[in-house]
Curated annotation (Swiss-Prot):
Signal sequence segment: none
InterPro entries in alphabetical order: Phage_T4_Gp38_tail_assem, TFA_Chaperone
Protein's recorded name: Tail fiber assembly protein U
Family, per entry: Belongs to the tfa family.
Keyword annotations from UniProtKB, A to Z: Chaperone, Host cytoplasm, Host-virus interaction, Late protein, Viral attachment to host cell, Viral receptor tropism switching, Viral release from host cell, Viral tail assembly, Viral tail fiber assembly, Virion, Virus entry into host cell
Induction profile: Expressed alternatively with tail fiber assembly protein U'. The switch from S-U to S'-U' is performed through inversion of a DNA segment called C by the phage invertase protein Cin.
Cellular location(s): Virion; Host cytoplasm
Record function comment: Chaperone involved in tail fiber assembly. Expressed alternatively with tail fiber assembly protein U'. Remains associated to the tail fiber and participates in the host receptor binding. Two alternate tail fiber assembly proteins U and U' are encoded extending the host range of the virus.
Keyword Chaperone: yes
Species assigned in the record: Escherichia phage P1
Primary location group: virion
Lineage start: Viruses, Duplodnaviria, Heunggongvirae, Uroviricota, Caudoviricetes
GO BP: symbiont entry into host cell; viral tropism switching; virion attachment to host cell; virus tail fiber assembly
One CC-aspect GO term: host cell cytoplasm
Amino acid sequence: MQHLKNIRSGNPKTKEQYQLTKNFDVIWLWSEDGKNWYEEVKNFQPDTIKIVYDENNIIVAITKDASTLNPEGFSVVEVPDITANRRADDSGKWMFKDGAVVKRIYTADEQQQQAESQKAALLSEAESVIQPLERAVRLNMATDEERTRLEAWERYSVLVSRVDTANPEWPQKPE
């Protein structure tokens, strides 16, 4: 099975390659061990999955046809076409680590960033519920149920705004 690591663009190494670059602006891609991507792509097996992953081992592309890939700046590995490997996708939630396709392991910083995004989304949702209820109260058009809902959502909004995203504990959303 093929595994080409850290593929980068580089200079042509033969006269033929130089002529192709000169005549057609061909960009040559080389793995860290000096293998030519355009030659190696022919050696991938047709019945395997080809996975492209970044410097953090995060899967960024998956295909059965290696010739469709532009792996510049990435690594490409060939893995068996089995259920365990087919479950992966290029959503950023999967990794190629220690020779296997695994669910992504997030760093503490990434987890905090995800919590920040979730916090912003929850606050936005709360505001979208609160605004029309506030308007109904301000215009003396609110029912008792709307006043109760407004208070519940405002309390929820305050609790969400106080969540420590380094160690999030999310409050229960009002009904």
